[in-house]
Design a protein with these regions (language model features):
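P-loop NTPase nucleotide-binding/switch module
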Residues: 100-156, 163, 173-233, 248-251, ...
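Short, surface-exposed secondary-structure edge patches
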Residues: 19-24, 56-61, 76, 84, ...
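C-terminal amphipathic alpha-helical interaction region
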Residues: 531-589
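P-loop NTPase catalytic core
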Residues: 224-228, 232-545, 555
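N-terminal accessory targeting/assembly segments
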Residues: 1-107
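Short, surface-exposed secondary-structure boundary micro-motifs
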Residues: 21, 35, 73-74, 92, ...
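Metallocofactor- and cofactor-centric catalytic cores in central/energy metabolism, strongly enriched
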Residues: 39, 48-51, 73, 135, ...
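Short beta-strand-centered aromatic/proline hotspots
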Residues: 6-8, 39-45, 150-153, 159-166
Length: 589
């Protein structure tokens, strides 16, 4: 730590101006001393010998003349074994440790190490003495839950290094020296199991960045089939309050085809964060049968916490995600909600007296949001393995208005858009993703032709529904009315899904493809129906049989029996495949 000091010259909310001597750098961490209590802060602007710092705590009691200690370090996350299962605040203070230290009502100025320095880990060396290593290559492994946690050459080292010595297999703390590297100048560099990395710098210790192609299966039919997300891709879920964002997030984190889940609750209401903290330890991971928390990290900053630390929580979470990606793991980062982070940027921009953009958000809002989502990616690592960080950000636009700046800036950089609809959530159609406005640039688990065919039915049915609101059911032709019934059936049996049923919530790729083919056969047929009442009765019966089918185990005897019931009803309705549907089913297109 440097001896660089300064003194407070003005205070404006959580923005404090500090006069300093010596050298101070942007994003440097400093501590403002208030009645012998150090408050963690970050330098966000420098003018001459005045540094403007944002304080990560409540600033009551700060006065002109208070001393400030500059550390010479950036805001950093501690990386090493012991991160999984932790609940942190935005500055990587473990909340459980803070509660033990200070009780339930935290006083400002309390900080704790991100990783326990006392716990011992079983280290197994994998690199041989004399090996030539670079930053991002590993020297050994440590078991952490269900994963082998790799111990890396620290990412901040540059150049090549020779492994001079390494400890034998045994139990060590994260602070103990486990190896010594020799650099190109012959200097010895001791390394331990943990090191720090600045959260605002992306970790780039990979060989190549690849295009995200493999689909990240969420087991949510509407997402995987119609608006898929790729591993290493990005997506956003904007929607009004109460539209089902949190339940969709829980379902995704539980069933998604990823190794690690990181939840950044930045600026959400305290009630929602408490709900997440109480429910996640009780959620059972279907892969292991154990608690989902064993492969989860939660970073929480509620809306009642200081505004500045919301920004830190977003960067801390993505840094932890990149760290586990470096091990060849697939990580899903769920940021809830990026709107609150943007509001924190707006507040600081106002205090800095910058020229405001639309709705008083800073003019650089788009570049900040883009820089965050660009840290997602699918990468090839030095050892030949592949890892990914997939970022899913929820946006909470006021009144569900998707035209506001945060949503629009997000839409420009993400690869998939899952727009939640108040109308669908009020009608209890969950997940409430609106299929008419959502989109994705990634590859679906079903063929493109089948996906477009189903979307055409949905759009056609929506048009007929809009017309019926004006002219009534009597004013529509039988063919239009049947199209409307088909779209309603597709919505009810495929787009809607019960997140609380173990079978229906977990709908894998094979089942989605099988059910899609059966649906196209039913929806792509013409029937011997002459009255609208007959058509309504027929499709209501068909819909109920499909819904019952959804609740049966795939390829079980019950599944086959329910499928036989569907086929019998199809024959009863005198179904005849159209040319387009027949071609789709034959070609797989």
């Amino acid at each position: 730590m440097t001896e660089n000091k300064g003194k407070v010259v003005s205070v404006n909310g959580n923005l404090v101006s500090v006069e300093f001597t010596g050298n101070v750098s942007m994003n440097e961490i400093c501590f403002v001393n208030v009645d012998s209590t150090p408050l963690k802060s970050e330098v966000i602007r420098i003018k001459g010998n005045i540094a403007q710092v944002q304080v990560y705590e409540m600033t009551g009691g700060i006065k002109c003349g208070d001393t400030v200690d500059f550390t010479g370090e950036m805001l950093s996350a501690e990386l090493g074994p012991g991160l999984l299962g932790q609940v942190y605040d935005g500055l990587q203070n473990p909340l459980a440790a803070l509660a033990e230290k200070a009780g339930w009502f935290l006083e400002r100025g309390n900080y704790a190490d991100g990783l326990s320095g006392d716990k011992k880990w079983l280290f197994t060396p994998t690199a041989q003495v004399g090996a030539v290593l670079r930053a991002g290559e590993y020297v050994g492994t440590v078991p952490e839950g269900a994963f082998l946690h790799k111990i890396f050459v620290p990412f901040y080292l540059t150049g090549t290094f020779t492994l001079k010595s390494i400890v034998e297999k045994g139990e060590y703390t994260i602070k103990e020296e486990i190896a010594v590297l020799t650099d190109e100048r012959g200097r010895d560099i001791p390394i331990s199991m943990s090191f720090k990395w600045p959260v605002k710098r992306a970790i780039r210790c990979y060989s190549e960045r690849l295009a995200p192609e493999a689909t990240m299966e969420t087991k949510v039919r509407l997402v995987d089939s119609f608006f898929p997300v790729a591993k290493g891709g990005t997506y956003c879920t904007p929607g009004p309050f109460g539209a089902g964002k949190t339940v969709l997030q829980h379902t995704t984190s539980k069933y998604a085809d990823v190794d690690i889940v990181i939840i950044a609750a930045c600026g959400e209401r305290a009630g929602e964060v408490v709900e997440t903290l109480t429910e996640f330890p009780e959620l059972i991971d279907p892969k292991t049968g154990r608690s989902l928390m064993e492969r989860t990290i939660i970073i929480c900053n509620t809306s009642s916490m200081p505004v500045a630390s919301r920004e830190a929580s977003v960067y801390t979470s993505v840094t932890l995600a990149e760290y586990y990606r470096q091990m060849g793991l697939h990580v899903l980062l769920l940021a809830d909600s990026t709107s609150r982070w943007a509001q924190a940027l707006r507040e600081m921009s106002g205090r800095l007296e910058e020229i405001p953009g639309e709705e008083a958000f800073p003019a650089y809002l788009e570049s900040y949001i883009a820089a965050f989502y660009e840290r997602a990616g699918y990468v090839l690592l030095p050892d030949g393995s592949k890892g990914s960080v997939t970022i899913g950000g929820t946006v909470s636009p006021a009144g569900g208005n998707f035209e506001e700046p945060v949503t629009q800036a997000t839409l420009k950089v993400v690869g998939a858009f899952h727009g939640l609809s108040r109308e669908r959530s009020d009608a209890r159609k969950y997940p409430a993703i609106d299929p008419l406005i959502s989109w994705s640039k990634y590859k679906s688990v079903i063929s493109r032709g089948k996906m477009e065919y189903c979307k055409a039915i949905l759009h056609g049915g929506s048009d007929v529904n809009a017309m019926m609101k004006v002219v009534g059911e009597e004013g529509t032709t039988l063919s239009d009315y049947i199209l409307y019934l088909k779209s309603e059936m597709l919505d009810a049996v495929y787009l809607q899904q019960n997140s609380f049923d173990l079978i229906d919530a977990n709908c894998g790729t094979l089942r989605q493809r099988y059910v899609t083919d059966k649906l196209i056969k039913v929806l792509g047929s013409e029937y011997g129906l002459v009255l609208k009442d007959d058509a309504r009765a027929f499709f209501n019966r068909m819909r109920q049989r499909f819904i019952d089918w959804n609740y049966t185990e795939f390829e079980s005897q019950d599944f086959k029996d329910k499928e036989r019931d569907i086929d019998d009803l199809y024959k009863e309705g005198e179904g005849r495949l159209t040319v387009d549907a027949e071609r789709l089913l034959k070609d797989g297109e």
